[in-house]
Amino acid sequence: MAMVDEPLYPIAVLIDELKNDDIQLRLNSIRRLSTIARALGEERTRKELIPFLSENSDDDDEVLLAMAEELGVFIPFVGGIEFAHVLLPPLESLCTVEETCVREKAVESLCKIGSQMKENDLVESFVPLVKRLAGGEWFAARVSACGIFHVAYQGCTDVLKTELRATYSQLCKDDMPMVRRAAASNLGKFATTVESTFLIAEIMTMFDDLTKDDQDSVRLLAVEGCAALGKLLEPQDCVARILPVIVNFSQDKSWRVRYMVANQLYELCEAVGPDCTRTDLVPAYVRLLRDNEAEVRIAAAGKVTKFCRLLNPELAIQHILPCVKELSSDSSQHVRSALASVIMGMAPILGKDSTIEHLLPIFLSLLKDEFPDVRLNIISKLDQVNQVIGIDLLSQSLLPAIVELAEDRHWRVRLAIIEYVPLLASQLGIGFFDDKLGALCMQWLQDKVYSIREAAANNLKRLAEEFGPEWAMQHLVPQVLDMVNNPHYLHRMMVLRAISLMAPVMGSEITCSKFLPVVVEASKDRVPNIKFNVAKLLQSLIPIVDQSVVDKTIRQCLVDLSEDPDVDVRYFANQALNSIDGSTAAQS
């Protein structure tokens, strides 16, 4: 092969690979752009590589997406901020492609580059780019333009700023709904850069146009603008211009707009302040909680606790609580589930007496809901109620339902109960645990779902830590060891798992007197899976018991297992023997 000029070689490889039929090769070369740019040097990168990329904007979307991302961090490879403008042409091309994710990444990269450019470069290169995109024939260019106005605006002259505001206003009235959507979506960002004198006169006029758009997809994006613009306006302007829009949107004919209001309600309340929230937004929120569209009720129900934090307890009880009671028996399981995921947080807001009077009956009905996710959401947040009403009342009112759920037909509900048991046990005390929950813990060890059995074994360890080895020796160990003769090998295996977890908590004496004989006996089991788990368990017991026990009992058992016909049993037995030899060598 003829000698190739070394600096030319990387660009030649890149060009070859970019034209290759294999998309993976083209992708790899794009992702190596920074390496190639280093090899070429800054000047050749500017003069050869970037123009080449500008001409290649008709590739697969995956390649173009990678290119858009790479160019966003390319300033150091073209000679620094002084030459950042050379990166604009390829990104401008990418802003006009059909694929949305490519355009969005190109816009993101343009924002990164534009925010670092010098003011004169912004005026000479970036602003003309924005204008070209905003005046583009193809709607994709105009959509992309909306996302970069806020970067262009900051470093402009007053004349250019006036021009940019007028151009943005035109985009808000564009014939294409996609462009108006982009204008609505980015209005908040643009507004943060616009001087306060133009907020009411110009930006709010654009906003008003968008809120009255005949397309619900534009109006729902204007909802997000309410919160963003509300933070920029003076309080009195916010009440005069934003509040009526929110109230109207909460009654919009499109459920998607109402859904967006419900979803953004907390942010909207922050924008208009506490007084308007109490007088104007409480009725709006109540309407959303009682909306005839389930999707809207789901969004509203999920915000009930956050919304109540903005109110005093009396208002919450008077206006919101009746809706919460209705939602707890809503015809949609998803509404009930959304409510269950947040309702426990209302307890600290309402206080002990109101929680007992109003919320406990709702908790109880949700705990007995036919839909497992509803029950699950309540169980996972029980500690929030416990902190408010105390454990005694909790045990009297909710615990019977919790115990019932311990045998729920859905394993995820049983799992949630298991994970809650150590907390319950620590707060209720030993006596209550022995009466109500002890038998359940053993029952879970023999559950037909592995995740439940594993969680139950971990549970035993946590209970032993909570109540101490003596209690565990009396109430847990005998029941666990009784299972060693269970006809099902998976349940026998669970005994080994429970021993491995409990042994470090129980200490050397109980491990040697109670656990070890059972483990040695299990080494003679007919099932290979049991035997190699015995080998692994014996290895984990080495640090817990005395060296004499290791030499006398554990080693001999492992030697027997190392001669087992099953290859896995022999492997784990030898691993354990090596571990013994290693620890012996370290001690000597």
Swiss-Prot record:
Q: Which InterPro entries match?
A: ARM-like, ARM-type_fold, HEAT, HEAT_type_2, PP2A/SF3B1-like_HEAT, PP2A_Regulatory_Subunit_A
The UniProt similarity line reads:
Belongs to the phosphatase 2A regulatory subunit A family.
Tissue localization of expression is:
Mostly expressed in cell-dividing tissues such as apical meristems. Ubiquitous, with higher levels in roots and flowers (at protein level).
Coiled coil regions, renumbered to chain: none
Ranges occupied by HEAT repeats: 2-42, 44-80, 81-119, 158-196, 197-235, 236-274, 275-313, 315-352, 353-391, 393-430, 432-469, 470-508, 509-547, 549-586
Secretion signal span: none
Q: Where in the cell is it found?
A: Cytoplasm, Cytosol; Nucleus
What are the top taxonomic ranks of the organism?
Answer: Eukaryota, Viridiplantae, Streptophyta, Embryophyta, Tracheophyta
Q: How does it assemble?
A: PP2A consists of a common heterodimeric core enzyme, composed of a 36 kDa catalytic subunit (subunit C) and a 65 kDa constant regulatory subunit (subunit A), that associates with a variety of regulatory subunits such as subunits B (the R2/B/PR55/B55, R3/B''/PR72/PR130/PR59 and R5/B'/B56 families) and the regulatory subunits TON2. Interacts with CYP20-1/ROC7. Also interacts with phosphatidic acid (PA), a lipid signaling molecule. Interacts with CHIP. Interacts with SIC/RON3.
GO cellular component labels: cytosol; nucleus; plant-type cell wall; plasma membrane; protein phosphatase type 2A complex
Q: Briefly, what is this protein's role?
A: The A subunit of protein phosphatase 2A serves as a scaffolding molecule to coordinate the assembly of the catalytic subunit and a variable regulatory B subunit. Seems to act as a positive regulator of PP2A catalytic activity. Confers resistance to phosphatase inhibitors such as okadaic acid and cantharidin. Involved during developmental process such as seedling and floral developments, root gravitropism, and stomatal opening regulation.
PTM section of the record: Ubiquitinated. CHIP-mediated ubiquitination enhances phosphatase activity after an abiotic stress such as low temperature or darkness.
- What processes in GO biological process is this protein linked to? abscisic acid-activated signaling pathway; auxin polar transport; auxin-activated signaling pathway; defense response; ethylene-activated signaling pathway; positive regulation of abscisic acid-activated signaling pathway; regulation of stomatal movement; response to ethylene
Q: What is this protein called?
A: Serine/threonine-protein phosphatase 2A 65 kDa regulatory subunit A alpha isoform
| Entry remark concerning the domains of this protein | Each HEAT repeat appears to consist of two alpha helices joined by a hydrophilic region, the intrarepeat loop. The repeat units may be arranged laterally to form a rod-like structure.
The alphabetized UniProt keywords are: Abscisic acid signaling pathway, Auxin signaling pathway, Cytoplasm, Ethylene signaling pathway, Nucleus, Plant defense, Repeat, Ubl conjugation
A Pfam family the protein falls into: HEAT
Q: Which domain of life is it from?
A: Eukaryota
Could you cite one Gene Ontology molecular function of this protein? salicylic acid binding
